[in-house]
């Protein structure tokens, strides 16, 4: 009697491995993207705290990263941050190849945000925004997930609802905002 596996048994094993890979790979990619965005939370919160400190000392919010009492661990300062993040100065953001953190201020509209976004991947130009003041339906100090309508290539809610478990709040300024749990 010969010992070994039959062709059918080998095909069944290959089929099972294929099914497991088809299920596991999208979940793995989702976990990687969520961890990349999660890495921006502490940076955005630190910039928010620095903005609050600046406001307490000066009575207004800063438009310049260099005037805040913080060093953002991203190397490049940009005059025009990507993803249509508003800017009021040439020192309003920091970025590397994959992420950007910006003082997303529009003093004329009295809207002041700290924004952090991904620049690459399936959720490019999506990220988190923290309003410094109440803006429409958005509450000051609460962290919101956002998808920039003009740059986001995915289905609405794909990033903020499905990946970040956000609840839709409002749309304005070319962004969909979702409240994070």
Predicted regions and their residues:
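Periplasmic/extracellular, small/polar-rich flexible segments of pilin-like filament-forming proteins
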Residues: 57-181
